[in-house]
Amino acid sequence: MRVLGVDPGMALLGYGVVEGGEPLRALSFGVVSTPAHLPVERRLVVLHDELAQLLEHWQPDVVALEQLFFARNVTTALAVGQARGIVLLLCGQRTIPVVEYTPAQVKQAVGGYGRARKREMQEMVRLLLRLPVLPQPDDAADALALAVCYFQYSRAAQLERFT
């Protein structure tokens, strides 16, 4: 099972590809960046094209996407929503299932605490994926955490079936 975690954003869209198994294995992670000087419609094309290449190359079985839970800044929320739309469109076109998680769900599944701090989360991702250093930038680390979250919730669901 291969999962692509996506932390959506207009300026930076984080991605992380994780292969299931014991242990979980990070295959790739990074960010897709869009130049701020481009108009929004061109930035969306950049996100679309780069993410399409990632989906084609890694062939994930599922995409774990951060759910837009709330935002203090309306402009930021709109930009994140537009980036999420690109992710959902591409997955829909390829019939790739999308599972959405709130930041609190990711923190609970990966960090063991729904209010874990960013550094704690990065350290847990590093440990769970046996990475030599903390994953950077933050958007890529968040995307890896989303992919790990998918596996953690899947394991919990399997355990519940046997109890």
Swiss-Prot record:
Co-factor remark: Binds 2 Mg(2+) ion per subunit.
Family note: Belongs to the RuvC family.
GO CC terms of this entry: cytoplasm; Holliday junction resolvase complex
EC identifiers of the protein: 3.1.21.10
GO biological process, any: DNA repair
InterPro entries: RNaseH-like_sf, RNaseH_sf, X-over_junc_endoDNase_Mg_BS, X-over_junc_endoDNase_RuvC
Description of how the protein assembles with itself and partners: Homodimer which binds Holliday junction (HJ) DNA. The HJ becomes 2-fold symmetrical on binding to RuvC with unstacked arms; it has a different conformation from HJ DNA in complex with RuvA. In the full resolvosome a probable DNA-RuvA(4)-RuvB(12)-RuvC(2) complex forms which resolves the HJ.
Cofactor(s) recorded in Swiss-Prot or TrEMBL: Mg(2+)
Protein name from the UniProt record: Crossover junction endodeoxyribonuclease RuvC
Cellular localisation: Cytoplasm
GO molecular function, one term: DNA binding
Residues the record lists as binding Mg(2+) 1: 7, 139
Positions bound to Mg(2+) 2: 66
Tagged with keyword Translocase: no
Xref: PANTHER family: CROSSOVER JUNCTION ENDODEOXYRIBONUCLEASE RUVC (PTHR30194:SF3)
Primary location recorded for the protein, binned into one broad class: cytoplasm
UniProt xrefs under SUPFAM superfamilies: Ribonuclease H-like
